[in-house]
């Protein structure tokens, strides 16, 4: 449940998040397994998994929900090989090349035949709603995956006025300044990893790990018109993360000191541990995110 990534969206119009109402709405779009001819299924599951029956998990006004996507695995190479075999056989039999539409029909028949025997791949994506802060957080590795889940939530709720939380000032400009000067806002510290890209279209990319970021070597790249597009940071010795120029937060790691605070809860009481960990994570993110966006120069006005 601890988020590993954080795609941050902000609510840009007035909307009420009612946990009881949302519970009913999510149930209407509950995940059901793929049937024999389904290529994929996408729906909501219990936020606590097998440890809870409710679709939502709520602490104060914060709401956690979870989407599950199941996809049938049909390798393109398998479909292509089957199609080529059938096309060759039919063209030999009829003594003429098949038309494009005939090949497309054959391909659909092959997919229909393979689907019932295809393996499935499933993944879960958590969404955290922070009404007081006006944020919706998606634990996804890309904005594309986050948008897919938010599209499902928008369909579920009927309306979801959110936009990516992108600071007014270009993130890469701020990150470059931090590395160039070696100075970061209070509470933030540079770690030893970064990515720099040339401002020229055909310029190079430098990726460095276990590197002193304020060294002459790194500064020479900045002097040669490269900007920092990814930067590993520490916040108050409680969070480590990699911030990208699109404001996405990856490889989010909560400190052991924080995560160990609930070790007094018996391991067999997993529901209680889940709830306690959720409260800890929410408290941390509720403090961290406003601090981060303030450090990045602030977000534009919601109606801007």
From Swiss-Prot:
> Which cysteines bridge via disulfide bonds?
none
- List the keywords (alphabetical): Cytoplasm, DNA recombination
Which terms does the UniProt entry file under GO BP? Answer: DNA recombination; regulation of DNA recombination
Cytoplasm is among the record's keywords: yes
In terms of domain of life, where is this protein from?
Bacteria
The subcellular localization recorded is: Cytoplasm, Nucleoid
Per the record, the major location class is cytoplasm
**Role description:** May be involved in recombination.
**PANTHER family associated with the record:** RECOMBINATION-ASSOCIATED PROTEIN RDGC (PTHR38103:SF1)
Family classification: Belongs to the RdgC family.
* The protein's name: Recombination-associated protein RdgC
